[in-house]
Amino acid sequence: MSNIKKVTSTELAGKDVNDIVSLVDTVYKKNGLHTELELQFIQLKINADPALTRAAKVNPESLYLSILQAAESGLSLNPQWQEGYFVPYNMKIDGKDVPTVIFSPMYRGKKKLLISKEIVKNITTELVYDGEFFDENIINGIHTITHKPDSFNRENPAKIVGGYAIITLNSGEPQYVVKGREYFERCKKQSENK
């Protein structure tokens, strides 16, 4: 975390989103983000989602912490970049459900962080559709994937049979993760339930 002082709910009471964003302005600038643009993205998201609007009003400290976390990560809330977003949650605090704003990095944001922190060189992901050639082998501890996509047969999401990621470590060594359709359906269902 940065050296910005902790702000309490009492100090945040009555402050609007502009005031809260101004508290982390230096963090945005340090990470190369434009505070004014990020403020617009935050306002658009909060105004478009009644649950986020309520959480920001009831629990402004959670909004502040989420904005601070987004700014410190260097991830933008620009919906076109798909690096991160705010999610409304009901958190149990002292036995009560309290509407809370949570910052959540998206896939592209996580990839950006891993590459920028030099944890990995690259991450490539691909979906596999019904009818495409896909072969996964592990021979003498060496993992390989052969996939021949059919670019003309990728319109229908119902035909997705799985997907994979190739993570290239800084050493140049590839790591593979392969998941079936059921995994993606579970992820989708979990995200819809939040």
Write out the residue ranges for each language-model feature.
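Binding-interface segments
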Residues: 18-194
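Glycine- and charge-rich intrinsically disordered segments
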Residues: 1-28
